[in-house]
Amino acid sequence: MPMRSLVTLPDPILREVSKPVEQVDTALQELADDMLETMYHAKGIGLAAIQIGIPLRMLVIDVSGNAEDTQKKPLVIINPEILWLSDERNVYKEGCLSIPDYFAEVERPKRLRVRYQNREGKQKEIEADDLLATCLQHEIDHLDGRLFIDYISRIKRDMVIRKFKKRAKEKNTQEAVL
């Protein structure tokens, strides 16, 4: 299982709307394994395919908080569709593997129900609350070209985007020198 490179802000692919998965096959299952390995290595709890540059409606999540292989409880979610969101809301301090080292409080519905296909292509539904609900919404947002910084004030969002554009420019300058 090769680890994949993470796409980070300001890469415009993060704003693309991902396309539905047409067929669940061995290649897609291998992609799911690569995504899980990448997510665990980066110490994340969720990863959308678009975050590794693949615009497919697919994500992986593991909010178990266990670092040991025997304790992991990964979810592979293909073509997710939110069926219901609660009126009750939660606030979590969110971060993102595509926006490293930046965190902000985001308010989202506390509970939701999602229909999806699992890694074998079987239709499933999950009802989630609290951290899992927040993580599902965060990752599904990626599939629709939205980032968690879209939920913070415009001033803060613009500041974050400028910071990451500057960081990318400095990185490109350093690479050109080498």
From Swiss-Prot:
GO terms of biological process kind: co-translational protein modification; translation
Note on how the cofactor is bound: Binds 1 Fe(2+) ion.
Coiled coil: none
Highest rank taxon of the organism: Bacteria
InterPro entries, A to Z: Peptide_deformylase, Peptide_deformylase_sf
Positions contributing to Fe cation binding: C96, H138, H142
Required co-factors: Fe(2+)
Keywords for the protein's UniProt record, in alphabetical order: Hydrolase, Iron, Metal-binding, Protein biosynthesis
Pfam families linked to this entry: Pep_deformylase
Any GO MF annotation of the entry: peptide deformylase activity
Active site: E139
Catalytic function, reaction form: N-terminal N-formyl-L-methionyl-[peptide] + H2O = N-terminal L-methionyl-[peptide] + formate
Known EC number: 3.5.1.88
Function, as annotated: Removes the formyl group from the N-terminal Met of newly synthesized proteins. Requires at least a dipeptide for an efficient rate of reaction. N-terminal L-methionine is a prerequisite for activity but the enzyme has broad specificity at other positions.
Assigned protein family: Belongs to the polypeptide deformylase family.
Name of protein: Peptide deformylase
Organism phylogeny: Bacteria, Pseudomonadati, Pseudomonadota, Alphaproteobacteria, Hyphomicrobiales
Name of encoding gene: def
